[in-house]
């Protein structure tokens, strides 16, 4: 029997695919809906079901009802319909094993009897034919002897009776002729009868041989087809029901034919009866066959599906992420084949593991299928396209980012421009997050972004460079180019933003502006007087020198860039900074790029959405709208967005929520799919990782940028022996949930410019958690370094403390060989490890067991004194050897 799929088998036995798959799984066979099932697997399932639920019932009774309508002609040419219901009850009885064996023995005996009868019939026919031939030969011989005797007698009579008259001779000749003709006729009739008898015997023998061969063939087919009997209990009821349906259709068809033939040709009633009777006999034969008759061929129950002879290439549609099992179903192959293909490509995955689009595309193409990549952001594109944007572009204010090394005077320079003292508000005078301000000058408005200069704030500086039009690079004239200065240059070049250099602290006596120009020229920043494109302005944020020149240079550069933006229409911009305020909720600092942002607009911001409930400028004043290049703080988002996210005003809040949820799910799936895979090449590397200490940290900060900066800095401190693990991080105060998480994971609670609330402090006191507050990032990183250094295993170092020369060797019954020594260097101490040197080569390393001076045990012997040394488990001490005594000291390691 050909293989069938799980779906086809479930449809055949009228059960669900999931139930059949579960039954196969219970039987120890893992299958999916499109897998093929062999006859052996069917037999295994049947055996399992019989063992679990008991064998099939010995008797099966089917009750069938067939309803039909019969039109009977009535009076007046009218006909009325009569409802006919045919009820049938059929019982199928399963033979028990003893009866089956008895029937098999009877059939075997019947076949042997038929074979014996056939052989006896053939032998009897042969004997009869032989006897007839012998009788005919004997009769022929008698006739020939009689004819010869008659001829001799006739000749004698002719010779002796020559005198008989002519009439007598004529009468005798006539008599002989008639006798000869009668004998010839009798001989021909006997030969004809013998030929017919031989033909009849041959026909009987041939018929017996044919019947015996047919019986043998039917028996062999019945015994050699285990498929028909293997799934007998599974398919008997369906086959019987199908046979009854066929029987009903045949009977109904016969009735229809009989009625039509009766109306057209009344004389053929007998033919109708014979035809319907033949149909019923055929239906009964089908039912008997459905019950498992042994002389029925199983071709009618064979499956029509044939397994494809070659692989079928399909069009596989792949989304952003897909599991291995889904990919296998799309390609109509088993999951194990996909896993094997991935192992050949160097990646290991389970059948439920999520893989990204690129990996799925490689696997599908490797298996010979055509890949169609599906774009899943149609909803997002539809929402973004349904926006009102103005057509007329107007000049806008430049967005200027002030970048440079830490303590080079960036914030002080901006403070002088704004005529405020903001630097005092920053902890330690260091800018902890991006400040966005716009100032009005005599020549126009300028928007400033102040970025941190510390090494930990790389991502914040990168965001500032991407959202800006002009970069003002602040370099201290007395300090020159520093690491963060170089990094700021790289960010500006990556964003393709023009650079204006402000040489600050020009009023200091040790200021050297020419040195700054020379150092910057090494990184591609050339002044205009040297043929470059960058303007150099000498300023002093403390004295206010050159500030107007710097503003003029910025506006001049903006005129060259011809900065324009659409003022009317729905606004779009970028998140500069975000944080969680305890009284106001999520707050985002947004820089508007195009359009006008109004209070009450529906905004979509990365994974978050919401309606703008309030807008404030950098001074904390309420505003109703904000145009291009204006930074504002907005309230009303569903959560704290990530810094750098795009902010877009949309029409429908419901659509905005759908897009935000879709982005969250997509981000989660992509993040899961791109996690580190267990590849073959790094499997052993993962297995050989030894004992690694971990410093678990729960981090809370005031703004999102500080969280990112501190997380990056702490993760960079990880080494092969000690790893920093950020268990949880977020914006806002330390809550009870954070304290519970720290207690469960044995983590340190770190608060950066935030404090713990009352409920969190109770948990911290109850669990004795380590809680630390910081306001300067330097102190935080240094203390985490110290904590990590305490987890490093100490370094072991051997320090030589004494050296003794063997002058003589004595024998002791208790310690064996005793070396009489002179201490030449340092001090010899008892129970310390020693080395025995011979010709400056170490020949033994062990422990000093006994140390005596004269006959007294001593703990140490100083330089220039004689002593006796007993080496533990070593007796091969010779004169001239050197005994070196050392001790092992531990050196505490630290993280640089």
From Swiss-Prot:
Binding site for GTP: 404-411, 450-454, 504-507
Chain spans, region Disordered: 93-307
Keywords (A to Z) from UniProt: Cytoplasm, GTP-binding, Initiation factor, Nucleotide-binding, Protein biosynthesis
Biased composition (Basic residues): 256-271
Location of the region described as G5 in the Swiss-Prot/TrEMBL record: 540-542
Subcellular localization: Cytoplasm
Pfam families per record: EF-G_D2, GTP_EFTU, GTP_EFTU_D2, IF-2, IF2_assoc, IF2_N
Annotated stretches, region: G4: 504-507
One annotated GO molecular function: GTPase activity
PROSITE patterns: G_TR_2, IF2
Keyword Lipid biosynthesis: no
G1, as annotated region: 404-411
Region (G2): 429-433
Region span, G3: 450-453
Protein biosynthesis in keyword set: yes
One CC-aspect GO term: cytosol
Ranges of residues in domain tr-type G: 395-564
Biased composition (Basic and acidic residues): 93-219, 272-285
Purpose: One of the essential components for the initiation of protein synthesis. Protects formylmethionyl-tRNA from spontaneous hydrolysis and promotes its binding to the 30S ribosomal subunits. Also involved in the hydrolysis of GTP during the formation of the 70S ribosomal complex.
Protein name as annotated: Translation initiation factor IF-2
Organism of origin: Klebsiella pneumoniae subsp. pneumoniae (strain ATCC 700721 / MGH 78578)
Organism lineage string: Bacteria, Pseudomonadati, Pseudomonadota, Gammaproteobacteria, Enterobacterales
